[in-house]
C-alpha cells in the first residue's frame, strides 16, 4: 500500500472500507521530502556499494553505482543525494556528495546531525554581503538619539562555554537607598531591516543552534560575533530597560531606552560564585574593581528573592546535563 513512498513524502491516498474500518492505499507520490540522506557506506560481497541511512524510518538502502562513490571507503559516514527514486522493479539509487569521515572521528557526529536534520550551516551570500556592509564598529550616526551608558560599569555574565554575549547589566545605588538596575540587550533590530536579506535569513533559520565545539548562528559572523556581541572594551548598540528597585525588592518605576554601552568585563557564573559565595581571594583580587558592583548585585538578588518567597513562588533547581 505504500507504493514506494518514503517517510515525509506528500502523497495522495485512496481510503477504502475494509470490514467496517478505514484503510488507506497510496495512489501517487506528490512531493519527495528528502533528496539527500546521511548514512554509512558499505560494499556488499559482490562489490556493489550502498549507503544505509541513519534514519531508522528509511529502511531501503541507497545503491551507489561505481564512479559515484566520491572516494568513500567502507565504514565511513557520507551524505548521499538521491538520483533515482524507487519503482516496483528497482530501489533507491544515489551518488555520494560528501565524505564526512569515520563515526569516531572528532566532529563527525556534529556534521551528521547538521545534515540529518537539514540545518542550514552556510549563510546566504546576500545575507553575508549585507552584514559585511554594516562594518565592524558602530558609527557616529548610529548613536544619534541614544542614551550613553558607557560611563557606567557594565558586565556580561554567562556560562563558561557561552559563545554569544547579547545581554549585559549595570547597577547603581540611588540617594534614596534604592537600586537602579539596567538590563541591556544587543539591538539586533537596528541592523536587520524588514524584508532585507538578513531578515529573510533569520526567518528561515529561526534560531541559533549550538554544538559542543561549534555554533550555527542565526546571523552571519559580522553580526553574531561582531556588532551584536557585547564584547568588552567596544561600544555596542542596545535596547535598555532601567528599573528602580526598592528595599523590599519591588520595581517602583522603569524606563526604556535606545542605548549605547561599553562592557567592562566578560564574567562567568563560576567566577561570580567564587567571588561572592566562596570568597576566593585570588578571584576577588583579579576582579577587584568589580567586587563592589557584584556585592550590590547580591544585595538586590536577596531582596528580589525574599519578595518571591513572600509571594509563594516555587524555584525548581534543575541540573543541566553536560557532555
Spans of model-derived segments:
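Short beta-strand elements
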Residues: 169-173, 179, 243-245, 255-258, ...
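Inter-domain linker/hinge segments that demarcate the starts of reverse transcriptase
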Residues: 141-145, 300-303, 307
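Detector for glycine-centered tight turns/loop "hinges" at secondary-structure junctions
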Residues: 177, 248-250, 312
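Active-site lining segments that contact anionic ligands and/or coordinate catalytic metals
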Residues: 152, 236-240, 318-320
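Polynucleotide-recognition surfaces of large bacterial nucleic-acid defense/processing enzymes
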Residues: 235-300
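Core structural elements
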Residues: 302-323
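Short beta-strand segments
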Residues: 184-186, 244
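Charge-lined substrate channels and their catalytic hotspots, especially those that engage the 3′ end
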Residues: 1-182, 189-234, 294
Amino acid at each position: 500500500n505504500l507504493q514506494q513512498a518514503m517517510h515525509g513524502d506528500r502523497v495522495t491516498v485512496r481510503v477504502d472500507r475494509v470490514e467496517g474500518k478505514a484503510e488507506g492505499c497510496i495512489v501517487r507520490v506528490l512531493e519527495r521530502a528528502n533528496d539527500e540522506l546521511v548514512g554509512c557506506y558499505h560494499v556488499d560481497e559482490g562489490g556493489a556499494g550502498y549507503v544505509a541511512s541513519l534514519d531508522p524510518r528509511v529502511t531501503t538502502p541507497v545503491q551507489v553505482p561505481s564512479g559515484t562513490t566520491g572516494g568513500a571507503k567502507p565504514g565511513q559516514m557520507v551524505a548521499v543525494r538521491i538520483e533515482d527514486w524507487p519503482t516496483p522493479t528497482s530501489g533507491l539509487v544515489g551518488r555520494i556528495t560528501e565524505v564526512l569521515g569515520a563515526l569516531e572521528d572528532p566532529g563527525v557526529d556534529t556534521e551528521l546531525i547538521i545534515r540529518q536534520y537539514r540545518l542550514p550551516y552556510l549563510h546566504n551570500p546576500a545575507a553575508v554581503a549585507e552584514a559585511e556592509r554594516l562594518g565592524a564598529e558602530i558609527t557616529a550616526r548610529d548613536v544619534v538619539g541614544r542614551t550613553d551608558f558607557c560611563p557606567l560599569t557594565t558586565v556580561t555574565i554567562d556560562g563558561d562555554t557561552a559563545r554569544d554575549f547579547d545581554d549585559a547589566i549595570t547597577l547603581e545605588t540611588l540617594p534614596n537607598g534604592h537600586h537602579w538596575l539596567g538590563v541591556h540587550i544587543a539591538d539586533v533590530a537596528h541592523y536587520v531591516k524588514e524584508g532585507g536579506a538578513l531578515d529573510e535569513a533569520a526567518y528561515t533559520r529561526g534560531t541559533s543552534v549550538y554544538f559542543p565545539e561549534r555554533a550555527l548562528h542565526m546571523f552571519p559572523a559580522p553580526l553574531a560575533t561582531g556588532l551584536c556581541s557585547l564584547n568588552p572594551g567596544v561600544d555596542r548598540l542596545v535596547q535598555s530597560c532601567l528599573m528602580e528597585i526598592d528595599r523590599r525588592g519591588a520595581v517602583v518605576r522603569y524606563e526604556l531606552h535606545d542605548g549605547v554601552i561599553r562592557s567592562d568585563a566578560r564574567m562567568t557564573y563560576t567566577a561570580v560564585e567564587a567571588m561572592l559565595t566562596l570568597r576566593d581571594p585570588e578571584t576577588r583580587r583579579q576582579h577587584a574593581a568589580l567586587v563592589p558592583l557584584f556585592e550590590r548585585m547580591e544585595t538586590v538578588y536577596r531582596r528580589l528573592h525574599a519578595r518571591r518567597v513572600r509571594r509563594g513562588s516555587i524555584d525548581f533547581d534543575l541540573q543541566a546535563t553536560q557532555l
